[in-house]
């Protein structure tokens, strides 16, 4: 499991407190679906995903993105216990949804890009390093059931 220092945890928590989860969630999931189009197969009930503008304007993408980022907020609250925090979501994505665990890593990287675009100079290399560690740890926790 990934170890986060007190400074890294503080940097993550500080930035997360300024995050607009609804806006950033839709943007993150939308970007994932545009940049990695094969991920769209997990969202075939979302309606029109035929173009980047259709995806980014899709209310179901926005709503699910908010749900994803709200769940990610649980990671912020439980940085030292991610495996337990995401046990049920890992089971759901593995057993029922059959999501390739690599997609969790891709979404984490997209989240880092969203953070960089939203926070600019505040998203220093040190802050990025902390977030990269966290999104990697979350991806591992979400993929735990697969092993």
From Swiss-Prot:
SUPFAM superfamilies found in the cross-reference section: Globin-like
Gene3D superfamilies of this UniProt entry?
Globins (1.10.490.10)
Pfam families recorded: Globin
Please tell me in which tissues this protein is expressed.
Red blood cells.
GO: which molecular function terms? haptoglobin binding; heme binding; hemoglobin alpha binding; metal ion binding; organic acid binding; oxygen binding; oxygen carrier activity; peroxidase activity
Any one annotated GO CC term: hemoglobin complex
| Residue list for modification Phosphoserine | 14, 51
The residues covered by the Globin domain are 3-147
Q: Give the keywords, sorted.
A: Heme, Iron, Metal-binding, Oxygen transport, Phosphoprotein, Transport
User: Which residues take part in binding heme b?
Assistant: 64, 93
Query: Which residues pair up as cystines?
Result: none
Q: Which InterPro entries match?
A: Globin, Globin-like_sf, Globin/Proto, Hemoglobin_b, Hemoglobin_oxygen_transport
A Gene Ontology biological process noted in the UniProt record is:
hydrogen peroxide catabolic process
Q: Which PANTHER family match?
A: HEMOGLOBIN FAMILY MEMBER, HEMOGLOBIN SUBUNIT EPSILON
How this chain assembles, per its entry, is: Heterotetramer of two alpha chains and two epsilon chains in early embryonic hemoglobin Gower-2; two zeta chains and two epsilon chains in early embryonic hemoglobin Gower-1.
Q: What does this protein do?
A: The epsilon chain is a beta-type chain of early mammalian embryonic hemoglobin.
Q: Which family does it belong to?
A: Belongs to the globin family.
Q: What is this protein called?
A: Hemoglobin subunit epsilon
